């Protein structure tokens, strides 16, 4: 019996060892799935960055990056306050997605100490915003920069998604947005005898009033929808600054107006009291629509773009696309 017991014990021990090996194999198989595609190298505006693990603690230093990461289901541990928002705080349209996000200072001068204290494993920004502090940032965590902001927002999303390992999710969201934009354009043309109306974008800031052209975030969205632009904005540039005496350049079938921060700091009052403004066809036809600056100008991502689509549908008097 003792020999049999010893044999049985040997079998039991062997089986347990095999089971343990099997469990280890499952664990090994599961680990890559949790961080599939990592480590990886990401080429960007400042060079190439090695990201060893799927990022979990992300800091974003501009609004486009904030829109992108929250759209992809990530609540950043830290973010900057928008540079046009002097009262501080994050964009209202993203408030539900940044409840635990820490403010790391203004966009123009992010607080390096606050960022370091958050122990991020990825930092996202752009060369145009933060080239001067890139070396400090990359000393804290892997840092990925796009070249600039605004017009290349779709390309920027691809870079951010690559750094996060969420390329498929980003592409699916972009496809859905572009489908909505095209559907809206078709509905608008149906209502206007097959012809797309012209759309103008006016922004009042602390300085000369701006007319936004084709190479801007809002300009790309208008193009996706298929709206035409007035001559002053049908240009492959970001924007045109105008004086109150040049505001007639803003006229179009639909005029969308945003105000950056405090209206008292802008020329809004002077412009809209000007006879030239009152003489615009859009003003006379009640086709001027004030829309949120934080989505039309500062959003620079799919979530903001979808809200622009919603605003245009409402202004054009057509159903909001699904």
What would you call each of these model-derived segments?
Residues 119-124, 142, 251-255:
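Proline-aspartate-enriched helix->loop->beta-strand connector
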Residues 46, 104-112, 235-243:
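Short helix-initiation/N-cap motifs at beta->coil->alpha
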Residues 57-61, 65-69, 171-227, 232:
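Basic- and aromatic-lined ligand-binding clefts that recognize polyanionic substrates
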Residues 65-114:
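A short, structured surface patch at a secondary-structure boundary
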Residues 84-88, 130-132, 147-159, 196-220, ...:
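Extracytoplasmic ligand-binding site segments that recognize negatively charged/polar headgroups
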Residues 253-322:
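Structured C-terminal subdomain patch of bacterial secreted/periplasmic proteins
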Residues 132-205, 302-322:
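Extracytoplasmic substrate-binding proteins
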């Amino acid at each position: 019996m003792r020999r049999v017991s010893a044999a049985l014990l040997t079998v039991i021990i062997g089986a347990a060892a095999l089971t343990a090996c099997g469990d280890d194999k499952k664990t090994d198989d599961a680990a890559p799935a949790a961080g599939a595609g990592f480590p990886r190298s990401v080429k960007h505006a400042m060079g190439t960055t090695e990201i060893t693990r799927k990022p979990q603690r992300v800091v974003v230093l501009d609004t486009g990056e904030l829109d992108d990461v929250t759209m992809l289901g990530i609540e950043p541990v830290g973010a900057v306050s928008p540079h046009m928002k002097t009262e501080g705080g994050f964009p209202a349209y993203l408030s539900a997605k940044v409840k635990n996000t820490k403010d790391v200072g203004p966009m123009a001068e992010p607080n390096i100490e606050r960022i370091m204290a958050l122990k991020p494993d990825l930092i996202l920004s752009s060369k145009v915003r933060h080239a001067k502090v890139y070396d400090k940032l990359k000393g804290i965590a892997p840092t990925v920069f796009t070249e600039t902001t605004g017009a290349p927002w779709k390309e920027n999303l691809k870079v951010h998604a690559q750094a996060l390992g969420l390329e498929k999710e980003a592409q699916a969201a972009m496809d859905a947005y572009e489908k909505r934009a095209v559907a809206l354009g078709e509905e608008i043309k149906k209502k206007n005898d097959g012809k797309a109306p012209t759309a103008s974008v006016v922004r009042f800031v602390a300085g000369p009033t701006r007319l936004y052209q084709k190479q801007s975030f809002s300009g790309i969205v208008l193009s996706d929808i298929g709206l035409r632009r007035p001559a002053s904005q049908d240009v492959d540039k970001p924007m045109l600054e105008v004086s109150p005496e040049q505001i007639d350049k803003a006229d179009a079938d639909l005029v969308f107006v945003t105000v950056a921060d405090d209206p008292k700091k802008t020329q809004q009052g002077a412009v809209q009291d000007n006879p030239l403004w009152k003489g615009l066809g859009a003003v006379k036809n009640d086709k001027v629509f004030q829309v949120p600056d934080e989505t039309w100008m500062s959003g620079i991502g799919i979530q903001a773009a979808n809200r622009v689509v919603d605003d245009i549908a409402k202004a054009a008097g057509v159903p909001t696309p699904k």
